[in-house]
Amino acid sequence: MPQLTVGSAIEKATSLLETAGVPTHEAETTARCIVASDRWGIGSHGLMRLPFYLARLQAGGINPTAQLKTVTDLPSLVVFDGDDGLGHWQLQKAAELASERAMVNGVAAVGVGRSNHCGALGIYVWPMINRGLVGIAFSTGPAVKLPWGGNKAL
């Protein structure tokens, strides 16, 4: 039985994303985040999602060549427009910038709007923790769950 190594999983996912039109750097960053989810035991946000992303790219629901556009840029606050791109590489870039700004300013918040699914959020916070920072990541999505005792999805 063939075995899938971490390296080969990243290479294959990167290749599939590139074939769908995603530039190499963004494709590899996305692939690394996806595979990291599986390595962390969060399979619901790992490689099983790749066919969904590829289908959305093919259907035009995700912009393969999206560019982060700066909406607001203050010392401790940056807001990007994600241009309907893949959330993984966009959140990775946002987390890196938040870390850099927090190291200089003591605190920082970076937001990305008009993006897509970004996978497991802990992937973006872990590098912050390794730098001695407190990181918080959150995301929005459609109302799909009822709160306990509720009658309307929030």
Residue ranges and their predicted role:
Residues 1-20:
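Generic N-terminal amphipathic, Lys/Arg-enriched alpha-helix
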Residues 18-21, 36, 40-43:
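N-terminal and secondary-structure boundary signal
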Residues 22-29, 44-46:
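Flexible, glycine/charged-enriched surface loops at secondary-structure junctions
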Residues 46-101:
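Active-site cofactor/substrate anionic-group-binding motifs, chiefly glycine-
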Residues 70-73, 102-104, 129, 152-154:
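Solvent-exposed alpha-helices and their adjacent loops that cap or buttress functional pockets
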Residues 79-83, 108-113:
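Short glycine-rich or small-residue beta-strand-to-loop segments that form or flank ligand, phosphate
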Residues 109-154:
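Glycine-rich anion/phosphate-binding loop at the beta-strand->alpha-helix junction
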